[in-house]
Amino acid sequence: MPLRPDRTARLLPALLAAWLCLAPAAAEERAPAVELTVYTTAEQEHLRLYKDAFEKANPGIHIHWVRNASGVLTDRLLAEREAGGADAVWGLAATSLIRLGREGLLLPYAPAGLEAIDPRFRDTADTPAWIGTNIWSSVVCLNRAAHPGVPAPTAWRDLADPAFRGLVSMPNPLSSGTGYLMVAGWIQMMGEEEAWRFMDALDLNVETYAISASKPCRMAAVGRVAAGLSFEYRAAQLKAEGAPIDILLPAEGLGWDMEAAAVLRWTDAPEAARRLMDFAASEAANRLYATNYAIVAHTGVTPSLEFLPPGLKDRLLAQDIAWASDNRERILAEWRRRYGAKVEEP
């Protein structure tokens, strides 16, 4: 039966209201998802955790990770300055981001909640080019169960003892940010001349300069070397799994760097990339970082990492990460000249 005109008139407002409610939802369903290509050095086992948490908080934005070592990604970003590539970085060394910022490759942005980020964990500009997420530092993984003849070192210089001949591994600083923070830390701690003398003596004991920061500690865990120079997360994780290692914090101090996040200048999805930055700086994200690292950027989050010796925060060197960034190419060129023959091939 046809509707009477008066009834039709009464129904039209309700139908229009229903259509207005449904149309945005339908349009949202039809809108294609945005995919962000994000360069990272974060540990493989952390990437799914970060991706799932971000995508749950930001429906319609998907992360495509590209993971590699810090030095490799830094060189790649410098090479991509004209053609572009990634949209953002999340988990790249601050020493790298300082350089990328000075080269004009970053898009400054003040993420939501910036006021809760420790000022030491961000670019100093009013609108920061990058923000830090967590600190990671150098440690020594020692396996005396497999190598009872080696002494227990209390200082970095102790690793030059001939008792460690062929029984030390450290990350290759040409590819690994952890390797570079060790070298830059020794130079700032000892002075250049003394630091190169120490590294000459250490090189006599090094079995290999490993391609990744995790590998030296893994090598110590299985007894391939006695001392694996690595970083605190991997050391604590392997010890939690039952590896027969002691985690040592050398008395002179620990080199360190920050993992950090930034939007890249050439991104085709700047709004989505800014939402990534908002999440990277959030308390929720920092609670994820705090399950893996001893020091995070958010002032309202206190990590508690099992199996690490007490006092790690107090052992961090009072180092200048801007200096480490500015001198990276010079230091690495000299390091390659002296020790490149022992670098592990990919």
Model-derived segments and their meaning:
Residues L11-A23:
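Bacterial N-terminal signal peptides
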Residues E28-I98:
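Early extracytoplasmic/lumenal segment of secretory-pathway proteins
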Residues T41-R48, G71, G85-R224:
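Extracytoplasmic ligand-binding site segments that recognize negatively charged/polar headgroups
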Residues T95-R99, A221, V225-P244, Y293:
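A ligand-binding cleft/hinge motif common to bilobed small-molecule-binding domains
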Residues A116-R120, W136, F198-D203, Y209-A210, ...:
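Periplasmic-binding protein-like
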Residues C141-A146, A184, D257-A269, L288-Y289:
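A bilobed periplasmic-binding-protein/Venus flytrap-type ligand-binding module shared by bacterial periplasmic
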Residues L264-Q319:
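Mature extracytoplasmic/periplasmic domains
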Residues E306-P346:
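Extracellular/periplasmic bilobal clamshell ligand-binding domains
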